Curated annotation (Swiss-Prot):
The keyword Cell membrane applies. Gene3D superfamilies: P-loop containing nucleotide triphosphate hydrolases. InterPro entries: AAA+_ATPase, ABC_transporter-like_ATP-bd, ABC_transporter-like_CS, P-loop_NTPase, PstB-like. This is Phosphate import ATP-binding protein PstB. Pfam families: ABC_tran. ATP binds at residues 38-45. It comes from the Bacteria.
Length: 252
C-alpha cells in the first residue's frame, strides 16, 4: 500500500449512547481512491463524516481515538475545524448548490479562507470548474444561478466548490445516487482524474461503482471494519467470508 494520507487508529463513534463505529483501524492511502461499501446503517457515512469532523455541528455526537492527517490527530482539541474542512472537502449524496451564481458557488469557500484579488479569484474559479470538468459548459453563464443547472452539472459544481479551496482530501458520500446513468458516468470519470491530485474516500451502495473507480475497498458491517484491501482482491478473493457473502449477494 502507498504511504497513508490518513491513519485511523482505535476510532469509536457515538450518537448519544449508541456506538456507531467500533474500534476502526485503517489507513487511507495518498492519492488513491478508497471506497467504503456495506449495507445501510453499517457506519460508512458516519466514518466519512469523522474525517472532517462534520459531526461537530450536531450535539450529542462524539468520537474517540485518533485520525491522523499527515501525522497530526485531527480529533485533538487544538484543531481549527474550519481550516480542517478546507483541507478535507466533502460532496454529499444530493447536489447541494447554494442559491447564488455559479461563480459565487465556487468562490464561496475560498472567500472564507483566503483573501484573493478579483483576477486571482477569477483564475481560481476557472481552475476549479476545469478540475470538475464543468468549465466548457458554464464559462459563458457564470452569473447564472447554480440552481439552473441540471442534476449532473449541479453535482460537478459541488465538486468544483469542494476543490476550489485546494484541499488535500476529498470525501464523496454517495455522490451519484441521485443522478442518471450518463451523469454518473461523467462523475466516475472525474473521480479517476481527480485522484492524480487528491486523496479520495467515497461511500457507495453501488458495488459495481466501487469496483470501477476505487483502488482500495473497505467492507463495513454494523459499525465494524470487516476487511480492507486492494479492490481487485476484495472483489475476487476476499479474506473474510462475510465480505464474500456481501459481494456475491448472499448477505441477508
Amino acid at each position: 500500500m502507498p504511504p497513508a494520507k490518513m491513519s485511523i487508529r482505535d476510532l469509536n463513534f457515538y450518537y448519544g449512547d449508541f456506538q456507531a463505529l467500533k474500534n476502526i483501524n485503517i489507513d487511507i492511502p495518498d492519492k488513491k481512491v478508497t471506497a467504503f461499501i456495506g449495507p445501510s446503517g453499517c457506519g460508512k457515512s458516519t466514518l466519512l463524516r469523522t474525517f472532517n469532523r462534520m459531526y461537530d455541528l450536531y450535539p450529542g455526537m462524539r468520537a474517540e481515538g485518533n485520525i491522523n492527517l499527515d501525522g497530526k490527530n485531527i480529533l485533538g482539541k487544538d484543531i481549527d475545524v474550519n481550516l480542517l474542512r478546507a483541507q478535507v472537502g466533502m460532496v454529499f449524496q444530493k447536489p447541494t448548490p447554494f442559491p447564488m451564481s455559479i461563480y459565487d458557488n465556487v468562490a464561496f469557500g475560498v472567500r472564507l479562507y483566503e483573501k484573493l484579488s478579483k483576477a486571482e479569484m477569477d483564475n481560481r474559479v476557472e481552475w476549479a470548474l476545469k478540475k470538475a470538468a464543468l468549465w466548457l459548459e458554464v464559462k459563458d453563464k457564470l452569473r447564472a444561478s447554480g440552481l439552473s443547472l441540471s442534476g449532473g452539472q449541479q453535482q460537478r459544481l459541488c465538486i468544483a466548490r469542494g476543490v476550489a479551496t485546494k484541499p488535500e482530501v476529498l470525501l464523496l458520500d454517495e455522490p451519484t445516487s441521485a443522478l442518471d446513468p450518463i451523469s454518473t458516468g461523467a462523475i466516475e470519470e472525474l473521480i479517476t482524474d481527480l485522484k492524480n491530485d487528491y486523496t479520495i474516500a467515497i461511500v457507495t451502495h453501488n458495488m459495481q461503482q466501487a469496483a470501477r473507480v476505487s483502488d482500495y475497498t473497505a467492507y463495513m458491517y454494523l459499525g465494524d471494519m470487516v476487511e480492507m484491501g486492494e479492490t481487485d482482491q476484495i472483489f475476487t478473493n476476499p479474506a473474510q467470508k462475510a465480505t464474500e457473502d456481501y459481494i456475491t449477494g448472499r448477505y441477508g
